[in-house]
Amino acid sequence: MGFTRRDLLTFTGGSAAGMLFTPVPWSLLRDTAVLSENWPGVPQPLHGEIRTRYTTCTLCPAGCGVRARCVGDRPVSLVGVSGHPASRGVLCPAGLVGHHLAFCRNRAAEPLAGGKPVAIERALTGVSAAIAARGPRESVAILDPRPGRAASLVYRRFLAGLPRGVHCAPPNAEPYGAFGIDLENTRAILSFGAPVLDGWLSPGRVLANRSHFQLIQIEPAYSRTASLADLWVPVLPGSEDDFAAAVARALDGETTDAHAAEVARILLRNKPAIAVGAGAAVARLNAKLASVGRPGGFLPRRDFTAVTDVARVPDGSIGVLLIEETAGGDPLPWDLLRRKLVPQDAVVVALTPWLDGCARHADYVIPAPMYLESLDEAPTPAGSTVAGFSLSPALLTAPPKLTPPAEFVLRLAHDSGTYPDILKQRVAAIKKDGRGAVFTYPDAKSTRVSDIASAGDLWKSMLAGAVWLDGPLPGGPFRGADLQVCAGPPGPALPPTPEYPLLLIAAGNAPPHGSPLMSKLYRESGLRRPANAATMHTDTGRNHGLADGDQAVVNTPTASFKVQVIFDVAVMPGIIEMGMVGMVGQAVSPASIRRA
């Protein structure tokens, strides 16, 4: 018999009925979903014992305590340590996903010389030869992004053995110098551009004390801190010193500026008060407020060692520059660093975990371990009124061919010691002095250093998760001028011209290297504006023939680039706000804009 129409209908009906009972379609859906979530390259947590380990975050100067939930030996989640005296149990978004940084694609994986892979021994030989070949007027410098560490001591010892060694730091690496901020007793903060509510000092410490201080934000951009402040006073870029002087006069009742008078009334009603920002006028304002050396103001601490601001190094004087870059630090100002190098034959060595940033301009790239891949240290937390120290034990296995920056400098100096040896000496010195107390992360208890049996026991406590905090330093006769040395000069602002009638300002820092696994949260949601976004007031855009969402071209005296126009009435008229990507190493620049 042939295949009839009845057979076709029977087969079709039976297949349809069978599909309702067979597990094949549902298995296909399940397997497809599982496979789509496990593409090659996505790290998979190990299956094993779940345990807790402790470390300290070194992505920024806050030095927050970290409790890591681990499966086997791999951390799968990070949270803050409850009761931590600096972080108050809080981690910032970058700290919460810090263990993801090891999986970023643009990592430096092996030593490079002239862009080509070399052995670490050859890199050491090349850098040593470059140092030996320097002329009598050329210096050798190390740019230290986190002064005050044991690694900083390694750098200073190495440079002390050279004829012209310079230990320097990025601008504002130590904005308050030998002083910390008594935030717990402060009742008002007058901020000149400081990101008080956006990563300033230790975020947990700021949030814990936010309810009892008034925040006045003085800056041209409507930043996140400005939007959350009790009062935002927009000022033109470069006029911050003038406004600080007006507030100082208003405190004596001698100004006609209404905004300055309002700020002065808030400061007088909420004492003790402090002013944070750069420039001599801000330092004089703190002297007027009597905030230096008193509770609720700026208090001195013991551990400060002054370091040269790289901006103060003479131009064209550095023959060999070693640059340490951290895993989570802000981009270093390459335009500034380039001016400090001798015009010809300068050698740049990048000690970095990244292939971008300064590595793009370096003659030698020495790959450094990523955060959590090697034993590290966290010095005194930013803005702390007492000295501090903690270890950051490794939680991840580091790839081969990585060299910690301090280890590289020790090998340059032909020192047989290791970086852990230097850290042990630091811990032994803390035990010998016998001051302060140690807060241990696992049990959230504080123990006086004098009650710890030996330096070895203190070292074990540090490795298990702990922070040492020194005792307070007695106050003394300090002046506001003592703070000026640490603040640094404000950035110059060029006035608009007929050719460039607008001011382009940097609004917000460039985002640090983030988690490669969390990018969908902002790439697909639009929560973060594009890197080429140019935000301006509606009137500013319309006066230049633009509409919201237009593509435009921004011109400055040094650069030209395409942008996407975004209207925002919170932006000051005559101002264009952009991220640091478009600023070409400047914070403020005159600019013009036209439709693309």
Indicate residue ranges for each PLM-predicted region.
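N-terminal export/assembly segments and adjacent metallocofactor-ligating motifs
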Residues: M1-G253, V365, R529, G541-N543, ...
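Generic, well-ordered alpha-helical scaffold segments in large soluble proteins
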Residues: F11, S15, R67, G126, ...
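A cross-kingdom feature strongest in bacterial/archaeal respiratory oxidoreductases
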Residues: R53-Y54, P147, R156, A178-F179, ...
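Glycine-rich phosphate/diphosphate-binding loops that line cofactor/substrate pockets in enzymes
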Residues: A123-V140, G180-A188, H259-A273, L289, ...
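Phosphate/pyrophosphate-binding active-site segments
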Residues: D241-V276
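Internal, active-site/partner-interface "lid" segment
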Residues: T256-A261, T418-D433
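A glycine-rich, hydrophobic/aromatic-adjacent loop/helix-cap motif
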Residues: R265-G316, P381, V467
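Non-catalytic, well-ordered alpha-helical segments in soluble enzyme domains
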Residues: P405-D421
